[in-house]
Regions:
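Flexible "arm" and connector segments at domain edges
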Residues: 1-44, 49-103
Length: 103
């Protein structure tokens, strides 16, 4: 096996590990919700967010690009399910407001 093949295998393994971390994180969110402890829920959700940023970086999506995609997602038209959530709770509007204040 040459250096290039070895490097490619290493990158694939790393990518698979980060994807597994994301899946584990989603499972932790579900367990934390079932447990009802806010700090555990926040930690588990943070793990998912961080895993998304790390995965994006390894796939060539920079942190700023991901931030911009989130902004576009929040500012753009909502899907049917998202619109239903927005109509009932106003979550997307609240998140947009929060992100604007944070900038």
């Amino acid at each position: 096996m040459n250096v290039r093949e070895s490097d490619m295998i290493r990158k694939i393994r790393l990518l698979e590990w980060v994807k597994a971390e994301l899946a584990v994180g989603v499972g932790e969110v579900m367990r934390a919700i079932a447990g009802g402890v806010r700090s555990s829920m926040a930690d588990a959700m943070a793990r998912v967010v961080v895993s998304c940023y790390v995965l994006g970086r390894h796939l060539g999506v920079g942190y700023e690009e991901l931030d911009e995609a989130v902004s576009r997602r929040l500012e753009g038209p909502l899907g049917i399910e998202e619109q239903e959530i927005e109509d009932r709770c106003g979550d997307y509007r609240a998140l947009r407001r929060y992100r604007r204040l944070k900038e």
